[in-house]
């Protein structure tokens, strides 16, 4: 940017079309967050009506994560070939239909399947909305674009908590899911009123359709084997999370099978850059493992361990969700100022100071608990708002939506594991201690993975000929792309 441009307030760098694109995507993400967290709010009610164990109830949260990898792949490929806008609309219709089906579910299996549909739609919404907004905004504002967008999910969670306190005590838990059909109306408006992303139009205007990840995996020479592996992964995940397997060794074998399948898909679709893709999946996996025990089981902790009534639960969740939303926006500013990776690490380190006090204070003072949760979620969860920007920078425009959607949503299986791990640990410890221990320990893993730029570092170690040295979204250098102590290591000193 020139000095003159730098003196202009950041928001004036955006025209009306760019703001409209952002507003539409943000509202879509708000509705996504609203629909997705409903199950966490009514988990105890559903558990009681269906007669579920704690682990079975937690698996209803996990179900949406099981299908996300496939939804991210398919809807991401749709976004790469036909445009980000169509993928956004399709995603909203999917998760809205799944939410409505939850309201009619007669039992556990039906609700589990409906949650699978929600997961597919959520995955598509994440990948398509993130790439849509990031590619529509100027390069120097793309951390803000990412952070501001993801704040919509947290705002949706806040709205859901408030609606829960008004609806469920009067009409019951099913009424909450019936409201989830409303986003379909919004999807119809989106289809006619928002422009296509600028980067995608420039790349594909007047050109033949790109060869997407779906083309490579399901229309190429290995299509039969890949279809079989897809069915195998889906079956393995079903048994892991809904099959009530008691043998840890069998679960471990099925988990390793899924990991091998996902790595195979990444190798086929990204070629020599597979080490980067695999490490991005690992980063996201641990990001979900540290954050989603709290996201998924906080309402249960408030209602059971602290014995809060629905109104008090809604108030505390307001602080938590609003803190995460504010953190997404703050993370966007920090990312554009410090650089994406440095902002991520600093924010997570600060959040570590608060995680133990949140669960040590107990329930005597609701306001103090709410304030602690606000700041902990602002620093620990909110910084994930710039994760789409971080991941998207490793992929070219041709495969960005599918690449972001697939890597993020395979890693998001950590969100499926997280509530179940939390519930299992809570069988030996109290739930608050289990949540604090998981979050505190696993956050350090994410700090190391992102701080050391392990995707670039592992790419350099294994396939250096395909190493990308600069972020494909904002053009800034990757710190892990250069050996430490190299004459070219001035990249490390540059914001990245």
Curated annotation (Swiss-Prot):
GO molecular function: carboxylic acid transmembrane transporter activity; sialic acid:proton symporter activity
Annotated membrane topology: Multi-pass membrane protein
TM segment ranges: 22-42, 58-78, 92-112, 116-136, 148-168, 170-190, 224-244, 247-267, 278-298, 313-333, 353-375, 406-426, 431-451
One GO cellular component, as annotated: plasma membrane
Catalytic activity reported: N-acetylneuraminate(in) + H(+)(in) = N-acetylneuraminate(out) + H(+)(out)
PROSITE patterns recorded: MFS
SS bond list: none
Pfam families: MFS_1
InterPro entries: MFS, MFS_dom, MFS_trans_sf, SA_transporter
Compartment(s) of residence: Cell inner membrane
Keyword annotations of the record: Cell inner membrane, Cell membrane, Membrane, Sugar transport, Transmembrane, Transmembrane helix, Transport
Function: Catalyzes the proton-dependent transport of sialic acid.
Record-stated family: Belongs to the major facilitator superfamily. Sialate:H(+) symporter (SHS) (TC 2.A.1.12) family.
Name of protein: Sialic acid transporter NanT
